[in-house]
Amino acid sequence: MTYPLIGNYGVCREDCESRRPWPDGFIVRELSRMPSNFRSDCTIQEYLEIHGVPGIAGIDTRALTKILREKGTMNGMITTNADYCLEKILPRLAEYTTGKVVEKVTCEAKYEIRGVKDLADNGPLSGSAVFNKEDFLSGKKEKKPSLVKELSGAGKRVALLDLGAKDNIARSLAMRGCDVTVYPALTSAEEIIADRPDGIMLSNGPGDPKECESIIAEIRKLYETDIPIFAICLGHQLMALATGADTFKMKYGHRGGNHPVKDLSTGRVYISSQNHGYVVDMDKLDSKVAVPAFINVNDGTNEGLSYTGKNIFTVQFHPEACPGPQDSGYLFDRFFTMMNGGM
């Protein structure tokens, strides 16, 4: 974490976008042990301990950030062994890769979320209906939160492929009256198509997109249908790979909630939330398949694609926000319009 003091306001249930924290390690300069916020449900230390995430404090994270900025993303290690042998450790660090992490973070089974106009407590869709601190810390999810104003039969049916999806993707669809079925990442295209969705969403997720070979093969089958598709972040990259494009690893990626992206169709610039280390290579795009729709104002890298002759559009940034600016939330409205036969 680049800010020097972390944990001032603790961990709040309503802010959680997944059933548990997914980092393999957590590094801070100074950890606040007495959070001061009426919304706080536990400390960061409690949260990490329950989920087995190792952490370390007392690190000059700003100096570390400068190194990563200049040298690029690199492998690192947190250890409790003060007598480690550097000569033995370095080869292990050099060989380390994240691997097929999507399979670790996806949901275990298919589940459904009904379309609504509002959420009773604006809580996370994967959370418990009644807050219980022990259940929250352990990641236990027995119930969905209460939903109000159900739009029975009025909503479009959306298939959401969970590649590590943030809750607010499903929430953004449900708030527009869509009935959302969430599928594990390794679900076959045939199963999704058999459920006859009005639209398909490919979610965000972690890791190198080229590690997702089997998922890419299924996405290719989804591309060949006439079902409208909207993809975000990792989903955007996988759709590109499924249709013959390429991706590459960035020096240190885009991280944070203040990245300007330009809509090439209007010239308008939006501030976006981003968290990715890979990007689609625009030099290897086939214009007969897809054309750039958004670019990053800072470095000119690709931030979105529009697929030629298809009801498919994808973005690298996070229109669902949570956290971050909500400037591009209109893209969910665009997807809804597309499912209704518009463009």
Regions found by a protein language model. Give the residues of each.
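Flexible loop residues that form catalytic
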Residues: 31, 205, 278, 310, ...
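Cysteine-nucleophile active-site neighborhood
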Residues: 199, 203-279, 324-340
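A glycine-centered loop/beta-turn motif at secondary-structure junctions
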Residues: 304-343
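Residues that mark the start of a beta-strand
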Residues: 155-159, 179, 228, 271, ...
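Catalytic beta-strand/loop cores that center a nucleophilic Ser/Cys/Thr
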Residues: 268-309, 343
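RNA-binding accessory domains that recognize and position tRNA/RNA substrates
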Residues: 1-190, 194-195, 209, 322, ...
